[in-house]
């Protein structure tokens, strides 16, 4: 499988950051009935289990989440881009990763649920992840993205993809794994996100992230989803447990709307209060965790064009720069570099490249998924 994507015409990019972050637990051990959407007896023999790659036992008891799984978060490992594509190398990779997470980070076990090697081998990460995938109803609480560890399946991909694209073998297997996860947990192709959508990190890498629209299309096709079943916009559901550039964009937009909040990317108490107040004032259901729901985003983000300026333009420029558009600077003016970057982003997501930031373009810009990205390319 070859992932179709627009050719690059740029980039000076920064070095890679680590793909896994400190653990934050969401959810607890609460037994629930198996989900009706799971496929009992699904063939998962192609996934190399912890026993098969000779994993160490966990250092502490592991927990199963009590809240529903609602997304997949894709990472790069920030490991070398090796040319050894063998299964033996993949097993050693899994052992090395577990050693790093347990001995270096002090975690109980491997942080992510699954690992994909550059050779396309798929391995179980955290103990119990394969059993939970087979059941399809309750995931293991992981350590791959603070704030999302109890509701997001984490997939680490071998390599560093700030300036390089993952090999086809990896992309093919990642699409297969994501498709299987979606089938078992009742998810969709539009539920696939990147680590930096919920955390301040360079993971999964700008070049890998450009492959995400094509990755989602591949999963969409394998699932046999109808275009009409895809929401017009699937926004990143940031909430008070996460942080990073997307949170900072929300803070900038809240500032534009008149709120006094620190623009730090930290989802602090002032941000929680501002989000909930905005929701109440705009007829949006107030979320107890200050989740930026679709109506919250869509009332908060103003449409922008070349006549626009100020805080929202600077917010868009900040987001573009954080995604690797190095030629974009925060001027607050809707300049040529900004329009050029917006057009490139629009083409990547199947949108008309008009250089204007509509509600739909805002969604794609902050890490969301738009229906147009699933059209035939």
Model-derived segments and their meaning:
Residues 25-42:
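C-terminal region of N-terminal signal peptides and the immediate post-cleavage residues
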Residues 81-86, 162-167, 202, 262-263, ...:
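A generic structural signal for short coil/turn motifs at secondary-structure boundaries
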Residues 104-113, 184-196, 262-264, 287-288, ...:
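Surface-exposed patches in mature extracellular/periplasmic domains of secreted proteins
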Residues 2-9, 37-77, 117-136, 141-252, ...:
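Basic/polar, cationic surfaces and motifs that engage anionic cell-wall
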């Amino acid at each position: 499988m070859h992932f179709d994507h627009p050719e690059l015409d740029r980039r000076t990019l920064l070095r890679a950051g680590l793909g896994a972050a400190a653990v934050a637990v969401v959810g607890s051990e609460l037994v629930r009935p198996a989900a009706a959407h799971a496929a009992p007896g699904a063939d998962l023999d192609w996934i190399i289990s912890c026993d098969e790659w000779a994993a160490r036992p966990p250092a502490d008891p592991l927990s199963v989440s009590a809240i529903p799984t609602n997304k997949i978060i894709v990472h790069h490992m920030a490991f070398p881009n090796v040319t050894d594509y063998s299964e033996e190398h993949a097993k050693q990779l899994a052992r090395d990763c577990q050693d790093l997470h347990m001995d270096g980070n002090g975690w109980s076990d491997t942080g992510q649920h699954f690992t994909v090697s550059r050779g396309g081998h798929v391995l179980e990460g955290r103990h119990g992840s394969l059993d939970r995938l087979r059941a399809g109803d309750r995931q293991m609480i992981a350590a791959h993205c603070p704030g999302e560890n109890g509701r997001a399946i984490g997939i680490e991909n071998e390599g560093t993809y700030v300036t390089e694209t993952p090999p086809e073998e990896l992309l093919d297997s990642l699409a297969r794994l994501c498709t299987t996860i979606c089938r078992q947990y009742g998810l969709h192709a539009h539920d696939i996100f990147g680590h930096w959508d919920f955390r301040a990190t360079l993971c999964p890498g700008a070049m890998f992230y450009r492959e995400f629209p094509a990755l989602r299309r591949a999963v969409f096709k394998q699932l046999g989803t109808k275009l009409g079943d895809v929401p017009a916009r699937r926004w990143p559901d940031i909430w008070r447990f996460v942080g990073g550039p997307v949170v900072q964009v929300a803070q900038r937009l809240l500032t534009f709307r008149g709120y006094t909040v620190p623009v730090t990317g930290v989802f602090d108490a002032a941000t929680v209060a501002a989000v909930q107040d905005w929701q109440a004032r705009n007829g949006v259901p107030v979320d107890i965790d200050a989740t930026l729901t679709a109506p919250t985003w869509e009332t908060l983000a103003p449409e922008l064009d070349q006549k626009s300026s100020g805080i929202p333009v600077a917010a868009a420029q900040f987001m573009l720069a954080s995604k690797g558009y190095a030629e974009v600077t925060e001027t607050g003016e809707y300049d040529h570099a900004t329009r050029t970057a917006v057009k490139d982003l629009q083409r990547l997501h199947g949108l008309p490249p008009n250089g204007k930031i509509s509600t739909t373009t805002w969604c794609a810009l902050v890490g969301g998924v738009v229906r147009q990205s699933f059209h035939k390319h």
